[in-house]
Amino acid sequence: MISRKDIDCGKEFDWGLTSENYAKYRDIYPAEFYKSIVELGCGTKGQRMLDLATGTGVLPRGMQKYGAKWTGADISKNQIKYARLLSEASGADIDYIASPAEELDFGAESFDGVTAAQCFMYFNQEVLLPKIHKWLKPGGHFLITIMDWLPFESEIAMKSEKLILKYNPAWSGCGRKRSTPSVPKCAEGLFDAKNIIAYATDIPFTSESWNGRIKACRGIEASLTSAEIEKWEAEHKKMLAEYPKSFKVPHFITIMDLVKI
């Protein structure tokens, strides 16, 4: 279990509880997201890359065709279990480690790039950033990426958020807007912020896949009881039945490119 005072008012959550649905419904990054990473000079043939808090390995699997050798690490053994299963099924050659990011131990200049997708907020950044700096080769890249749905631009997303809050009032992952993140203070002296890519994009869903994606979020399956999840899901599916079976939800993607000094 993870608990932080600045996330969900300290309510405990465990991503390992979401793994089955996470594996099935959260591989939703668009092709342009992966192309943006390559355009920043990361994930290409001959490079070694590390993905922190890899979950079920969505990002390294999506980057496989560009030729880099990837390692994925996650605090949850169950997430890593599914990451390995999915990689084996797709023929992806990815190494996986079950470990908190702050406890990883690699040699100096082990990687050309490090990625952290949807997860940087969970880390002890003062501990982790000097380690990432050590692991990166000279001029190496640390990419912090975020992809949030936009509830103020989607009626479905807004109604889904309201239902999450009904069953989990402590959930703090709501109300996201089009905004770019600030450079972490503890990056000063270690990294230069070379690029920040930001754009909106529509992600296609069906009623089933959107329900699964929301169910696998921190506010539901990672933190509620089975009885609470069952009640939420019945109400959520009833809400979705009022809309077409296929629809798009606007998301905002940001990629912050921190280059090792």
Q: Which stretches of residues belong to each language-model region?
A:
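A short beta-strand submotif of the Rossmann-like class I SAM-dependent methyltransferase core
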Residues: 116-117, 125
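Conserved catalytic/acceptor-binding region of the Class I
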Residues: 133, 137-203
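A short acidic, Gly/Pro-enriched loop at the edge of an enzyme's catalytic core
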Residues: 102-113
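A short, conserved alpha-helix within the catalytic core of class I
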Residues: 123-132
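Conserved class I S-adenosyl-L-methionine
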Residues: 1-44
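Nucleotide donor/acceptor-binding cores
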Residues: 46-47, 109
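Conserved Class I S-adenosyl-L-methionine
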Residues: 182-261
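Class I SAM-dependent methyltransferase SAM/SAH-binding core
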Residues: 50, 56-103
